[in-house]
Amino acid sequence: MSDILNKILDVKADEVAAAKKYRSLASLRDEVEGNKEARAAIRGFEASLRAKIAAGQAGIIAEIKKASPSKGVIRPDFHPADIAVSYEKNGAACLSVLTDVQFFQGAPEYLKQARTACALPALRKDFMIDPYQLYEARSWGADCILLIVAALDHGLMAELEACAHELGMNVLVEVHNAEELTAALKLKTSLLGVNNRNLRTFETSLQTTLDLLPRISPDKLVITESAIVTPDDVKKMRDADVHAFLVGEAFMRAPDPGVELGRLFN
């Protein structure tokens, strides 16, 4: 595990502990489980991706991200609702919205604003380590949550996956290498993200996805993450029968993120 990931997880544990003192899990659970309208309004994250792919298009998870630990502020002019509308207009299947405050300058409000502004399902992009965060995610409107294998042991991963599914959310499990893939394949979810960014060096290479593909069964929906910068990168993945993408920085640095999505994928 990288030093930065360790640091993030330590902070995340403190954040969850503080949140529980402010509001108990029992109280949050009662709110989420008692809100039948919100449960009925969950948008199918996996279904949206598969519908795009079935129509011969790329299934694009378009990310809304203001900053990152390695790059600092990526988009100073940051309006989540406007970005979400532009993504939807230009063919995105889903949203990914950063809610981590300290390291990515995200916020729960950004998730709420983005999802309310459009009809796309939304992923809470954060470092999930406790069931409490899943109830938070659902209360904010998330349709999917992220589990990062590098950050979790298998028992906790399985517990978080089961909790998310009970709440009606999809689960995207993220891996960086073959060892993590072996652990991820023990989960039930079909959504398998391959992050092309090395957690130690922060360098990116699409070869990471290509190397892991032969180990993944066809029933899994492979989502390649990071390192998608040019139309040639997209073609390289689609030629390898990878049709789902999570892209953030390439869109966020453009004047209009949705227009850049259209340029990159059409």
From Swiss-Prot:
Recorded hits in HAMAP family, A to Z, give: IGPS_B
Show the CDD domains listed in the entry: IGPS
The family classification in the record reads: Belongs to the TrpC family.
Is the keyword Amino-acid biosynthesis in the record? yes
NCBIfam families, per this entry? PRK00278.1-2 (NF001370), PRK00278.1-6 (NF001373), PRK00278.2-4 (NF001377)
Q: In which pathway does it act?
A: Amino-acid biosynthesis; L-tryptophan biosynthesis; L-tryptophan from chorismate: step 4/5
Task: State the signal peptide span.
Answer: none
PROSITE patterns, alphabetized: IGPS
Provide a Gene Ontology MF annotation, just one: phosphoribosylanthranilate isomerase activity
GO BP annotations, alphabetical order:
L-tryptophan biosynthetic process
Top-rank taxon of the source lineage equals: Bacteria
> What are the record keywords, sorted?
Amino-acid biosynthesis, Aromatic amino acid biosynthesis, Decarboxylase, Lyase, Tryptophan biosynthesis
Kindly give the Gene3D superfamilies that the UniProt entry links to this protein: Aldolase class I (3.20.20.70)
Q: What class of enzyme is it?
A: lyase
Per the UniProt record, the source organism is: Janthinobacterium sp. (strain Marseille) (Minibacterium massiliensis)
Q: What is this protein called?
A: Indole-3-glycerol phosphate synthase
Record-linked PANTHER family: INDOLE-3-GLYCEROL-PHOSPHATE SYNTHASE, TRYPTOPHAN BIOSYNTHESIS PROTEIN
Documented EC number(s) = 4.1.1.48
UniProt catalytic activity = 1-(2-carboxyphenylamino)-1-deoxy-D-ribulose 5-phosphate + H(+) = (1S,2R)-1-C-(indol-3-yl)glycerol 3-phosphate + CO2 + H2O
